[in-house]
Amino acid sequence: MKVVAIFLASCVLFSLIPTHLSHEEPKVAPTEELMFAPSNQPRYCRSRQVFDGSCTDRGTPRTTCFLDFLGARSASEMPKNCDCTPQPNNKRLCECSVICTDCCVKN
């Protein structure tokens, strides 16, 4: 009787081994992959704005204009590649690339 119990226990244990050793990742259906893929790419336009102060008031000229645009506009415009041009009367002209109002280019 002990031999039969040991044999059955061994069979059960050995039948479980292949399921624990297979570490395959579940396959993702192509439709699920497309659901999470970005369908639109943001389109950037150059935008200008005049601010008070010099180009180095808040660090480098690029940083100063970047921070000016963030403070004066919505962060969703995502300013980048900013340039600063000193102007008369302690002013600065900031020009940054921001997301255009029509936003995105369809793929």
UniProtKB/Swiss-Prot annotation:
The keyword Hydrolase does not apply. Pfam families: SCRL. GO terms for cellular component: extracellular region. It comes from the Eukaryota. Disulfide bonds join C45-C100, C55-C84, C65-C94, C82-C96. It is found in: Secreted. InterPro entries: SCRL. Keywords: Antimicrobial, Disulfide bond, Fungicide, Plant defense, Secreted, Signal. Residues 1-22 form the signal peptide. One of its GO terms (biological process) is killing of cells of another organism. The keyword Disulfide bond applies. Belongs to the DEFL family. This is Defensin-like protein 242. It comes from Arabidopsis thaliana.
